[in-house]
């Protein structure tokens, strides 16, 4: 995957910002649903954090029928993800998708490292007040497809594949089913 220019800031300079995705927004089709300006910038690593899945205030996600991705500080661990360059006009749609107004996630500014070791500052999200819970098989699949699509390190992809999902076998929203189908056809 060709790398776009990753210069920039998570904050208020210029007309774009950098967003570090580690969950369902790893998959291009998923992020483009609400944030069409997103352009792949690079694969990056968030040091001293760990990936987790949970239900905000103990309530399962109605969209995904299981725990959704979050990160927490954990010395020695790392989370791999994708840095997307986005127009500032998409900040509100990204915040809405992440449930910022309702308190599901809070906006954080983090420093991530590219494969070349360059440090860049990005906007990201962290879930507050959650109980750990496994993801649905469908949600896990979207994350794994996004990791594969964008070439996250193979060892990290194997860790993602090893995550035990819950046993949900029902349907998820048509919109999410569509992004899974599009992702599958692109990756096959």
UniProtKB/Swiss-Prot annotation:
<comment type="function">
    <text>Catalyzes the formation of 5-oxoproline from gamma-glutamyl dipeptides and may play a significant role in glutathione homeostasis. Induces release of cytochrome c from mitochondria with resultant induction of apoptosis.</text>
</comment>
<feature type="binding site">
    <location>
        <begin position="19"/>
        <end position="22"/>
    </location>
    <ligand>
        <name>substrate</name>
    </ligand>
</feature>
<dbReference type="InterPro" id="IPR017939">
    <property type="entry name" value="G-Glutamylcylcotransferase"/>
</dbReference>
<protein>
    <recommendedName>
        <fullName>Gamma-glutamylcyclotransferase</fullName>
        <ecNumber>4.3.2.9</ecNumber>
    </recommendedName>
</protein>
<dbReference type="GO" id="GO:0005829">
    <property type="term" value="C:cytosol"/>
</dbReference>
<dbReference type="GO" id="GO:0042803">
    <property type="term" value="F:protein homodimerization activity"/>
</dbReference>
<dbReference type="GO" id="GO:0001836">
    <property type="term" value="P:release of cytochrome c from mitochondria"/>
</dbReference>
<dbReference type="InterPro" id="IPR013024">
    <property type="entry name" value="GGCT-like"/>
</dbReference>
<dbReference type="Pfam" id="PF13772">
    <property type="entry name" value="AIG2_2"/>
</dbReference>
<feature type="modified residue" description="Phosphoserine">
    <location>
        <position position="173"/>
    </location>
</feature>
<keyword id="KW-0597">Phosphoprotein</keyword>
<comment type="subunit">
    <text>Homodimer.</text>
</comment>
<keyword id="KW-0456">Lyase</keyword>
<feature type="active site" description="Proton acceptor">
    <location>
        <position position="98"/>
    </location>
</feature>
<dbReference type="GO" id="GO:0003839">
    <property type="term" value="F:gamma-glutamylcyclotransferase activity"/>
</dbReference>
<dbReference type="InterPro" id="IPR036568">
    <property type="entry name" value="GGCT-like_sf"/>
</dbReference>
<comment type="similarity">
    <text>Belongs to the gamma-glutamylcyclotransferase family.</text>
</comment>
């Amino acid at each position: 995957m060709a790398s776009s220019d990753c210069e920039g800031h998570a904050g208020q300079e210029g007309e774009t910002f950098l967003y570090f995705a580690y969950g369902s927004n790893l998959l291009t089709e998923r992020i483009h649903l609400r944030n069409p300006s997103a352009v792949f910038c690079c694969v990056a690593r968030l040091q001293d954090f760990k990936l987790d899945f949970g239900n905000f205030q103990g309530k399962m996600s109605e969209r995904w029928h299981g725990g959704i991705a979050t990160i927490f500080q954990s010395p020695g661990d790392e989370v791999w993800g994708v840095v997307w360059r986005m127009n500032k006009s998409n900040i509100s749609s990204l915040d809405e998708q992440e449930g910022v107004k309702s308190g599901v996630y809070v906006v954080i500014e983090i420093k991530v490292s590219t494969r070349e070791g360059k440090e860049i500052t990005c906007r990201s999200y962290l879930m507050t007040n959650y109980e750990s819970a496994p993801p649905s098989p469908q949600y896990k699949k979207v994350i794994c497809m996004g990791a594969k699509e964008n070439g996250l390190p193979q060892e990290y992809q194997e860790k993602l594949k090893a995550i035990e999902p819950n046993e949900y076998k029902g349907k998820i929203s048509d919109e999410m089913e569509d992004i899974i189908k599009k992702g599958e056809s692109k990756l096959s």
